[in-house]
Amino acid sequence: VPEEKVRRILFTMSKDKTKREACRQAAAEEIMKYLDAGQSVAMPVLGDVGIYSTYSYVHKQLIKEGYEVQMISGIPSFCAGASKANIPIVEGNEGFGVIPSLKGLEQVEKAMDVFDNLVIMKVGSHVKEVYEMLKAKGREDHAIIISNVGMEGEYVGPLLPDREYGYFTTMIIKSL
């Protein structure tokens, strides 16, 4: 795609819901300008468009405004990361769950009681707390960290509780 045709749309990751919604609305309006001009628009995302993607909010807004839009699946970051770590996410009759860490340790503990294997997305700022919980359960060695997969600063390896992790950090906790 020629550079003059590429438009970057940045989203805020603010904890302020009003700011996030305003940013998403502005993104939808920007896209609508091009669609109204008869142009085709593609919006690549990091990971898969259907798994915790900010685009899904823009997608809903475009549909609400009457535009015909389509989501095309990508490779979820936890699948790409598991491949890079050379581990399967599940085997045989195992089950797995995917949750955000944003709701706290209680949700993580409940999910661990239900699923054989667990994927925790956006865990970067909560790694130490999850590590302490895993250590109390004797499972700290069963966690793999996947951070910035495919981007600068990529890390795929064991959970290191004293390491700094960014927003795009996922943890896979394998069964015993």
Language-model segment annotations:
Residues 8, 43-45, 71-74, 91, ...:
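General beta-strand structural signal in soluble alpha/beta enzymes
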Residues 17, 45-46, 68, 95-96, ...:
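Flexible, glycine/proline-enriched loop segments at strand-loop-helix junctions
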Residues 50-111, 162:
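Class I SAM-dependent methyltransferase SAM-binding "motif I" and its flanking Rossmann-like core
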Residues 1-67, 157, 161, 169-170, ...:
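Class I S-adenosyl-L-methionine
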Residues 19-26, 53, 76, 103, ...:
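Conserved active-site and cofactor/substrate-binding residues in soluble primary-metabolism enzymes
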Residues 14, 76-79, 127, 151-153:
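Short gly/pro/ser/thr-enriched loop/turn and capping motifs at secondary-structure boundaries
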Residues 41, 112-176:
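A contiguous loop/helix-start segment that scaffolds small-molecule binding in enzyme catalytic cores
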Residues 35, 93-107, 151-153, 168-176:
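Short, basic, helix/turn surface patches
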